């Protein structure tokens, strides 16, 4: 059993129940609603590399993305050799037919989709953006090529050792996230621009996938590679975690500051002191909670509203103190307070970072995926590789979440 992901509104989730078979389950009421089976794969169609990959925890048999609760899903079977891993199918689950098939030059790593756009990430660090209404290719973004062009313009040549590292897969993977709103705000990680010799993926690009134009560029959101990324439903917030996994940061995707302040850091939380591989994060529909899960026995839930109120109180007290000292005019107080409320958290020492508001204890020997349902506030869905689907309530006062119900699949 291998859980893949929830859809955009957490009304369904997908899982691999047996080889070459992918199942979609409805969350409320809980039950199986679709099963996709592929023909039996012969030994000739699965090469050694693919079989080795399939045994690892990092490689799913399928890459899937559902379109809310509609009958359309995008699916790639990565368990049938490298040729199949380059083919993406759009499937109608009601008719059990393939609507269209797309073939890419490299293996498909991830798919994100909403009602307007589908974005496909390849192992070559390329992002293909499609109009979902007609499956027309609108744009191709090459993250690695952009970095290599920068290196050429700066040094006049590209180091072969850099290209070699990329081909050998020694660098971290590009991460992508697309908001479920029709605005289609796409966020993806990019190679560090401030250090042209660095091939760390710790920059963040905010891209308008509806109008095909860049919106914002966030430099060095973490010291190390960004290992996990998620975006709010409305596309206004993006959350990041590095490969170390101790700090979680949330940024504004748009540049709304009237003062030049660099990255728009909204929130910063400490997940823990020990390193952790965070593999999924979710922001709830109201933008109050952020949940993250990794290779530990705890799912952390952070309260963004609570920290925002604390930041406002801190900025108000600091701006008032400055006024008393005669360092600010009354006219500039509101502007400065607004600026400070957005940036003050970056000045707080690490040891004072807020930790989780609520948590869920889980089995750290299995993988879990998260969902915040649109129709139920203060509720979290957890689907796990051990075949359990759990519904949890977030307590108003915080602390350990309350298990509401549990189902087996």
From Swiss-Prot:
Predominant cellular place of this UniProt entry's protein: cytoplasm
InterPro entries: PROPPIN, WD40/YVTN_repeat-like_dom_sf, WD40_repeat_dom_sf, WD40_rpt
Membrane-traversing stretches: none
WD repeats: from-to residues: 1-35, 221-261, 273-312, 361-402
Protein location: Cytoplasm; Membrane; Vacuole membrane
Gene Ontology MF annotations: phosphatidylinositol-3,5-bisphosphate binding; phosphatidylinositol-3-phosphate binding; phosphatidylinositol-4-phosphate binding; protein-macromolecule adaptor activity
GO cellular component terms, semicolon-separated: cytosol; endosome; fungal-type vacuole membrane; phagophore assembly site membrane
Membrane topology reported for the UniProt record: Peripheral membrane protein
Keywords noted in UniProt: Autophagy, Cytoplasm, Membrane, Protein transport, Repeat, Transport, Vacuole, WD repeat
Extent of motif L/FRRG motif: 269-273
SMART domains for the chain: WD40
Biological processes, Gene Ontology terms: autophagy of mitochondrion; cytoplasm to vacuole targeting by the Cvt pathway; glycophagy; nucleophagy; pexophagy; piecemeal microautophagy of the nucleus; protein localization to phagophore assembly site; vesicle organization
Domain free text: Contains a beta-propeller domain involved in specific binding to phosphatidylinositol 3,5-bisphosphate (PIP2).
Family classification: Belongs to the WD repeat PROPPIN family.
Function in brief: Required for cytoplasm to vacuole transport (Cvt) vesicles formation and mitophagy. Involved in binding of phosphatidylethanolamine to ATG8 and in recruitment of ATG8 and ATG5 to the pre-autophagosomal structure. Protects ATG8 from ARG4-mediated cleavage.
Record protein name field: Autophagy-related protein 21
């Amino acid at each position: 059993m291998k859980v893949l992901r929830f859809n955009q509104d957490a009304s369904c989730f997908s899982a691999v129940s047996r080889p070459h078979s992918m199942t979609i389950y409805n969350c409320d009421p809980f039950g199986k609603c679709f099963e996709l089976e592929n023909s039996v794969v012969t030994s000739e169609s699965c090469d050694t590399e693919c079989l080795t990959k399939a045994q690892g925890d990092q490689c799913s048999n399928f890459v899937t993305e559902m379109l809310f609760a509609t009958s359309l899903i995008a699916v790639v079977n990565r368990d049938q050799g490298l040729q199949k891993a380059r083919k993406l199918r759009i499937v109608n689950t009601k008719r059990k037919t393939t609507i269209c098939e797309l073939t890419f030059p490299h293996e498909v790593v991830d798919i994100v989709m909403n009602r307007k756009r589908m974005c496909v990430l390849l192992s070559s660090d390329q992002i293909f953006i499609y109009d979902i209404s007609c499956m027309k290719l609108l744009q191709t973004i090459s993250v690695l090529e952009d970095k290599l062009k920068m290196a050429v313009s700066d040094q006049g040549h590209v180091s072969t050792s850099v290209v070699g590292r990329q081909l050998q897969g020694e660098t971290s993977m590009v991460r992508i996230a697309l908001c479920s709103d029709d605005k289609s705000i796409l966020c993806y990680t990019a190679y560090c621009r401030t250090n042209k010799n660095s091939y760390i993926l710790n920059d963040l690009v905010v891209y308008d996938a509806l109008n095909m134009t860049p919106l914002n560029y966030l430099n060095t959101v973490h010291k190390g590679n960004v290992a996990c990324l998620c975006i709010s439903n409305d596309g206004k917030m993006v959350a990041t975690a590095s490969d170390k996994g101790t700090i979680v940061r949330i940024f504004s995707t748009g540049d709304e500051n009237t003062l030049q302040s660099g990255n728009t850091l909204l929130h910063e939380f400490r997940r823990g002191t020990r390193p952790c591989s965070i593999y999924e994060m979710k922001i709830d529909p109201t933008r109050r909670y952020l949940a993250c899960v990794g290779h530990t026995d705890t799912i952390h839930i952070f309260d963004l509203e609570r920290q925002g109120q604390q930041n406002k109180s801190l900025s108000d007290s600091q701006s008032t103190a400055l006024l008393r000292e005669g360092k600010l005019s009354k006219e500039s107080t509101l502007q400065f307070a607004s600026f400070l409320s957005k940036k003050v958290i970056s000045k707080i020492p690490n040891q004072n970072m807020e930790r989780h508001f609520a948590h869920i204890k889980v089995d750290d020997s299995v993988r879990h995926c998260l969902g915040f349902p649109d129709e139920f506030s203060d509720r979290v869905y957890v689907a796990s590789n051990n075949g359990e689907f759990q519904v949890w309530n977030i307590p108003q006062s915080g602390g350990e979440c309350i298990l509401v119900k549990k189902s087996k699949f």
